[in-house]
Amino acid sequence: MIVLILCLLLFSYNSVICTSNNDCVQGNVTQLPGNENIIKDFLFHTFKEEPSVVVGGYYPTEVWYNCSRSATTTAYKDFSNIHAFYFDMEAMENSTGNARGKPLLVHVHGDPVSIIIYISAYRDDVQPRPLLKHGLLCITKNKIIDYNTFTSAQWSAICLGDDRKIPFSVIPTDNGTKIFGLEWNDDYVTAYISDRSHHLNINNNWFNNVTILYSRSSSATWQKSAAYVYQGVSNFTYYKLNNTNGLKSYELCEDYEYCTGYATNVFAPTVGGYIPHGFSFNNWFMRTNSSTFVSGRFVTNQPLLVNCLWPVPSFGVAAQQFCFEGAQFSQCNGVSLNNTVDVIRFNLNFTALVQSGMGATVFSLNTTGGVILEISCYNDTVSESSFYSYGEISFGVTDGPRYCFALYNGTALKYLGTLPPSVKEIAISKWGHFYINGYNFFSTFPIDCISFNLTTGDSGAFWTIAYTSYTDALVQVENTAIKKVTYCNSHINNIKCSQLTANLQNGFYPVASSEVGLVNKSVVLLPSFYSHTSVNITIDLGMKRSGYGQPIASTLSNITLPMQDNNTDVYCIRSNRFSVYFHSTCKSSLWDDVFNSDCTDVLYATAVIKTGTCPFSFDKLNNYLTFNKFCLSLNPVGANCKFDVAARTRTNEQVVRSLYVIYEEGDNIVGVPSDNSGLHDLSVLHLDSCTDYNIYGITGVGIIRQTNSTLLSGLYYTSLSGDLLGFKNVSDGVIYSVTPCDVSAHAAVIDGAIVGAMTSINSELLGLTHWTTTPNFYYYSIYNYTNERTRGTAIDSNDVDCEPIITYSNIGVCKNGALVFINVTHSDGDVQPISTGNVTIPTNFTISVQVEYIQVYTTPVSIDCSRYVCNGNPRCNKLLTQYVSACQTIEQALAMGARLENMEIDSMLFVSENALKLASVEAFNSTETLDPIYKEWPNIGGSWLGGLKDILPSHNSKRKYRSAIEDLLFDKVVTSGLGTVDEDYKRCTGGYDIADLVCAQYYNGIMVLPGVANDDKMAMYTASLAGGITLGSLGGGAVSIPFAIAVQARLNYVALQTDVLNKNQQILANAFNQAIGNITQAFGKVNDAIHQTSQGLATVAKVLAKVQDVVNTQGQALSHLTLQLQNNFQAISSSISDIYNRLDELSADAQVDRLITGRLTALNAFVSQTLTRQAEVRASRQLAKDKVNECVRSQSQRFGFCGNGTHLFSLANAAPNGMIFFHTVLLPTAYETVTAWSGICASDGDRTFGLVVKDVQLTLFRNLDDKFYLTPRTMYQPIVATSSDFVQIEGCDVLFVNATVIDLPSIIPDYIDINQTVQDILENFRPNWTVPELPLDIFNATYLNLTGEINDLEFRSEKLHNTTVELAILIDNINNTLVNLEWLNRIETYVKWPWYVWLLIGLVVIFCIPILLFCCCSTGCCGCIGCLGSCCHSICSRRQFESYEPIEKVHVH
């Protein structure tokens, strides 16, 4: 049926004839001329590894079909249930580009994207393109494909917008010898086109069916036309490829178990030692010396660079040896490298779910010094010193616990632990680390070689041995195993690593800073006369054996300091420069404490000096550390800290002594690497290269350059942010500048490749050599800027003619890397739009009531910082004072935030007594307070009372001023943590109950305070808003009017645009009442319907979910804050009292300091979350105020602000921590689509100007008759545009302003950076504190009681069925609220005045016109009366002029 419908659709569009299998005949492409090796060429073209590899996939190994037809019509065929599709050309004329064949279209169906391969052989399509480039692969999101566009239109009309296009050639040199095709899965697509394979990362749901459209006349000659053969592949096959010394062979791999294991575990490393893309990483694990990563994506340094991969199907009984140095890579699969081998990885693949190791297996580690340690495991515990039974490491799944030991000559040196239940990988590093499944199982001295013997028997074992080196890579881990690797080995991959994604979308990305690595060290010091002291420390280790033969370092080991003042216990530095060195010796004894023999074998040990409690390391003392005083002592008296001296054996480290340090901070004494006595300037400068510098005590990494500047004052110069800008060499006065090693740059990435980069300096980067300049940056690109007009000059839009793929401000970057301006419009005497876009304008409406919840306030929280951190311990409180004002800052931040919020809420919530009296169903239907003219109305509430009874408060509800919906909301919500403040606090202070989480919060200084707003006040506020709607809605008055008239006043505004007449009000009222009734039922039944909620209840469900989240978020945060008291933050205990009981005061202070740091960090995280939440609520509160003013108190003219539609009126109800708005809107049901113009760009010769519409509520569009019209956006009412509707603007360019976060305060004055506020808190802490990792992503979430009802419904099928039936009825009722209004298609609307207004106007005209005529005609010097008077006066006397006084110049001061 589907195929028939599709055929009919295709026929209707393209006159397509659907063919059946009878129209296609089987063919064999290898029988065509030159196609004997087509399969081999295809496989080896895709996989170039050497020497052998097994590949699996959906390869073209099935039947080929030739579907050529005798008629010249276009034909259609479907391929179903396939995972790959291939096609090949039988022949095509090898011309100069004008192919004479017919087109082919291949459509791979999927969601959300589909892929189309289109081969156009028409002369018109080929001519404007490069020769032989008339194939196109299009990745499109279009759901409906118009095949006629592809088979007739030019390429410029197809694959538009965001569709990805890959053009390719389809006429190879040897006709018909190349296979084209697609292979797909849910993660990526492989396209075999243009003599290469494209790996496209596409996450998609493929339907596994393909549609092809083709056309070929069988009457055409072989030399003049093309015929295609097709193959859809549904079977997964394996091939074994061998490529040795250029000799290529292949064979079908039919042993499924062998082929699967080989293809899964064996690969051929590519050039450089990289693991090829697509490898499964079966049983490859991350190396870790601490915790194991479960899942995630991160950049790490791992042994993933393969120097040699040795596939081993099975081992014999003989022992195998593998060495790190001088390894012979004679059996490598693929390339082999001579790099240093860091880790040898044994990757194991076992198909049997039983114990796989059939014989004895012992790993022998040849460590430094020739001592061989053995790693073996036993199935029971062994208590004797000699292990008479032979152990083994069982590979695969073990049948019981295995206890592992490190052995030497049959003696257990160390118990390692229990072997994992399933051993999949063993990795051994040359530095002595032994990993099992990625975990560091054992560490010893560096290892030279590894040997072991293994018998796999018939277990189906399959091995690979990889000689690997460490490299940086982006690793994706799933369930602790590696799933995908992206090497950070190129410019584009470095960006991928910095963005933590293997697939980069088109756009601009910051260029990751290159790792500095090992660089020269520059030191700048003041010249001085140096006296130097060399301190040589000798450590004599004493080693002996335990009763079981394990090596033990004696505490009688000796430390010798240089003699000073006949004292060898304390040595103080008395010079201004010093260097510290130590060397160790090792002596052993049998059982006593007389150490007079050299240490051999496992008794050999070396001395190491560990940091201990000092804030600096022993090996860093000679790295220019400065002190005022520095002494070494063997006694702890007066010491500031100590170094731990340990003996390091092949199995462990044992602390034998302590070396104490007495020091004072300062800069009089400096530790230096070597002796430089005398008058010296010890400064060492490395110019014009990246260097690690220490300049007058300021350290960093940068490039030092000599300048020509002259500055008389200062030694070094910094910016306002503290960065070092330059310094002066006091010896010669030369000024040097210091600049970063890396410059700021942004790379333009298109289709996974870097095509350009914007940088601040004119220097080549990212391998880009071609450049041009703009007013703001330099641009480097793959585009060849060699023209004199573009090289080094500002770019002009005429330089490059291309379509930008990505944009940055008003600049675009094309696929070829060219940079173009995108806001310049060129025209000559023609009218062009500034910008256009299709818009839909409604032509008819229905009514809808939409629910919206907005949070208004949060519950304030008070925290006693010292109580939370120290729980009243006096010693802890003393330590807490060292953190300066940390607690004060935390407490003030919470207090100020709470006060600010309370002030804002208090100013927002005000209640009108008059309005509150009317805010009830009873008052709306009462005539006591109304004007007498309304008392005769049968229903004061009007037609709208049926719906209002659930929104308006009722005196008969549980509480006064609450509506039915408010009662439902407050009854349904159950708060978590500290919701009911009074009840919880009273219960906790009783002391008779076991302290639960709520009590623990109060006991530890956390208390929720009652806020300004509560449920009753919010209910009164919203009720007052409802009552205020009917106060003075017709211009103001002391007496309320019926709600129906208030609503009618709101409808009058809409009537001016939508022709809503009075007779439609009853229709709207009925729809409103029905919608409100169904929403009320939805609030009551959403607990029964949350899992099967439909579209009709989606709004209500979302609102309740948001209410639940708002109410419980703070409780969850407080619960998590309290749970942090159980975290020990790497201390020995989470109890402060317990720590002081178990340790001495000094050690306990160090442990408690960790608790203080961790708990302050937890408080800071909570404060940061609270401040962020308050900022969000502040914005939400402002939004609520705006909606109250614009939606409730008035009628909004903004479309979508008060509900998604044309706003009529809104009512508000109180809800937990906020308000719920019920927006009554008109929703469009019919639309007219027009192409809107934002303006007109007109030119006349050299003059160019723009015209834009004056009224922003009007839309300018060009109709089908090529005439311009204006129409309101709210209703399609086209009128002819006039000149008065436009405003002229200067030009047509569209400009944008780029701003950084630093620039935002200058643009938005009230912008607050919350992160900076928290940073200010952290800066007040001690500088030497350490912040532990404190993830806040797991909360003890508490949900509404809806969840329990949902779970209960799952066990009551009968009730669920009934609920489903009720919901179906309810959904139908909601859907029935959509009503059609009467539509009158009127272009213009005239307002008619009543008859008495016209009568009044007539009387005024009759009275005023005679008076005006008399005044104008009879008065004045030229009037009738004036003329008559002048004549009479001139006859009787001569006209006299009045005398006047002369005017003098007056100066006013």
From Swiss-Prot:
Pfam families listed in its UniProt record: CoV_S1, CoV_S1_C, CoV_S2, CoV_S2_C
Region (Heptad repeat 2 (HR2)): 1309-1406
Stretches assigned to the Virion surface side: 32-1394
Species annotation: Canine coronavirus (strain K378) (CCoV)
The protein's name: Spike glycoprotein
Membrane topology value: Single-pass type I membrane protein
Annotated spans, Heptad repeat 1 (HR1): 1041-1160
Region (S1): 19-791, 32-780
Superkingdom: Viruses
Keyword Mitochondrion: no
Organism phylogeny: Viruses, Riboviria, Orthornavirae, Pisuviricota, Pisoniviricetes
Region (Interaction with host ANPEP): 661-805
Signal peptide positions (record): 1-31
Ranges that cross the membrane: 1395-1414
